Amino acid sequence: MKKGLRRFLLALAVLIIASSTTRIVNAAEEEKPLGPGWLSLDCCIGPLDNAIANGKDSLQKASGLNFGGYLDTSYTWSSNHPRSPSDISLRYFDKDYNKIVFNNFHLFVEKPEKDWGVGFRVSGDFGRSGELLREATLWGKALHKEPSAELREAYLTTTIPFGEGIGVKGGLFVTTLGTEILPNPGAYNDNISRSFLFNFGVPLRHLGVLANYQVHKMVNVNFGVVTGWDDPHDNNHQPSFMGGVTLTPSDMVTFASNLIYGAEQRNGAPKRFTISNVLTVKPIDPLALYLEYTYGQEDDASLGGTRDGKWQGLSGIASYNWTDRFNTALRAEVFNDRDGARLLGEPFGNHANATVAEVTLTGSYKFTKMLLGRTEVRQDWSDRNMFKRGASTADSNQTTLAMQLIYTF
């Protein structure tokens, strides 16, 4: 993580130096400034924001590349005080209890297709999130002592001149399933913590090829072939197939349904199927509503392997921008793992037919255009004792509090 921090400081210095040679941007081209705020830090951090933005702009123009990133640090507390190890149960990217964690120094570089007919995107994570992403997506050899650097995405893009154009990307890319995402600069999840659906219901990344086609101005379809769920290695010489459709009947409503099907185990016999349906509604400008239903099943994946494993979950998120600085997001969900196939990592073994639920409230405030602060309270429940308490007991609920700072450039 120290190497990642050094890289961040070096990149920051380059951007500031480059900004000294940047001409003043015309007022018409400048972004609209944030409104006044009691907690605004525009007076002291705003000049740094402007220097970095100007330096980035000049470097992008000189190189013909788009690039950026963010720095993310957070702290999470749990009412269960887990010990030995001090991991918060059924969490992943926010599982470290009572620690100030340098989560991420994220960088991306991309090239549009317009110059060469072929574009690319490469992005990487440096820090704790890099370690956890590597563990979660089976790139590492073991689930511990992973390096604090991980290649998140690396793919080429092109467009086949057929009809409206078939967009194709090949390489390592983030999944199309689910509401929540692996965050990108300026595109974060509405909450600090991730949902159970994100952690256990859907994959995170794929290695393969994915195409998309605009059938109609309201209809987009995608289809592709990948090595499987979160596994860059072809562990069974059988590809998995992805497909989906996105419907946009109006500017206010979007519905996306995506699925993946294929063999995920080493012997290649059991097949896994998952479909994720996400409805997005934006009835008024400050308000966004998200509703997700995800269903999955896998052959012979129950505890003991005596029957198929099935899981499903329902979640809803309401996000409201009270001002251009202040946002609140409320998330609620329920997730059922009927056969103990998905809720892995429980403190005292997996449970069949376990149901977990949570309600999360997150407040976000933009101290400047680039500096975002967030606080969160979350309550988890289960019909089983699945949440570790102390060193040797488990409980049916837990409460967590979290704080986060994100600096985007």
Explain the meaning of each model-derived region.
Residues 92-129:
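Glycine- and aromatic-enriched membrane insertion/assembly motifs of diderm outer-membrane
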Residues 62, 112-116, 161-164, 175, ...:
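Outer-membrane beta-barrel channels and translocator barrels
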Residues 69, 73, 102-111, 153-158, ...:
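Residues on the lipid-exposed face of transmembrane beta-strands in outer-membrane beta-barrel proteins
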Residues 67-73, 118-122, 166-170, 221-223, ...:
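Transmembrane beta-strands of outer-membrane beta-barrel proteins
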Residues 72-76, 123-127, 173-175, 224-229, ...:
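Outer-membrane beta-barrel pore domains and translocons
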Residues 80-99, 129-155, 159-250, 256-263, ...:
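Surface-exposed coil loops of outer-membrane beta-barrel proteins
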Residues 2-85:
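N-terminal periplasmic/intermembrane-space "pro-region" immediately following the signal or transit peptide
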Residues 30, 41, 91-94, 130-133, ...:
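Outer-membrane beta-barrel pore domains
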